[in-house]
Design a protein with these regions (language model features):
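Extracellular/periplasmic helix-loop junction at the C-terminal end of a transmembrane helix
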Residues: 80-107
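Alpha-helical transmembrane segments within multi-pass membrane transporters and channels
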Residues: 39-78, 122-126
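Interfacial loop-to-helix junctions that mark the boundaries of transmembrane helices
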Residues: 41, 66, 104-118, 187-191
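Pore- or pathway-lining transmembrane helices of multi-pass membrane proteins that form conduits
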Residues: 64-88, 191-199
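Hydrophobic alpha-helical segments embedded in the membrane of multi-pass proteins
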Residues: 1-5, 22-26, 53-57, 123, ...
Length: 199
């Protein structure tokens, strides 16, 4: 899931997004707090929304404020570090004896519950992403990464496409963070370090 998110920004949009480390941890923070309060599914869904918002901020910095992509990613990542600490209210949180989507899946899939839960989420994310890329909006997004000037000549708002691309990419990265937190039954404010390289 992390690789799918990085694939959108680096390969489709052809723009480096260094905010990935912060967005991954954002997914961890949102997911672990919701799971800690007894609603792991809501945690997964909210992490997707939070990641999309963070990605949109990076996109707006690049398109509307003309900030260089690398600097925009660093700005967003730095801001997210403080936001993530505020969400979690402490450096780390344990989900010991708390319900997660994996413990919920154990009731249905037995010994293979972790693999099954992760596989189901991955398949859903991949199918939705590749379906989207075949729609008109998805093709416009791909065209923006290939040739932005031609896209503008075709009266397509390339800035909007970039913002949408960053939103989708970071939503997927945040989702991967949410899954990781519930898989490991713990959330750490530094868990996103190096995720760009991993992806």
């Amino acid at each position: 899931i992390l690789a799918l998110g990085i694939f959108i920004s680096f390969r489709i949009l052809d723009i480096p997004d260094l905010s990935v480390d912060g967005t991954f941890t954002l997914g961890v923070a949102v997911s672990v707090m919701q799971a800690f309060n007894g609603d792991p599914i809501k945690g997964i869904l909210l992490s997707i929304v939070a990641g999309a918002i963070a990605g949109s901020v990076t996109g707006i910095l690049i398109t509307k404020l003309n900030v260089q992509p690398i600097l925009a990613g660093i700005i967003t990542m730095t801001a997210l570090y403080s936001i993530n600490l505020k969400i979690m209210d402490r450096p780390n949180i344990s989900l010991y004896k708390k319900d997660t989507i994996f413990t919920m899946a154990q009731k249905y899939f037995g010994d293979y519950y972790k693999l099954a839960a992760a596989g189901i989420v991955l398949v859903i994310a991949a199918v939705l992403l590749f379906w989207f890329l075949k729609t008109q909006a998805g093709m416009s997004l791909r065209a923006t990464g290939d040739n932005e000037y031609m896209v503008r000549a075709s009266s397509i708002n390339s800035d909007r496409m970039k913002i949408m691309g960053f939103a989708i990419a970071n939503a997927l990265v945040s989702l991967s963070g949410a899954m990781y937190a519930q898989y490991s039954s713990a959330g750490d404010s530094n868990s996103g370090t190096g995720m760009l390289v991993v992806g």
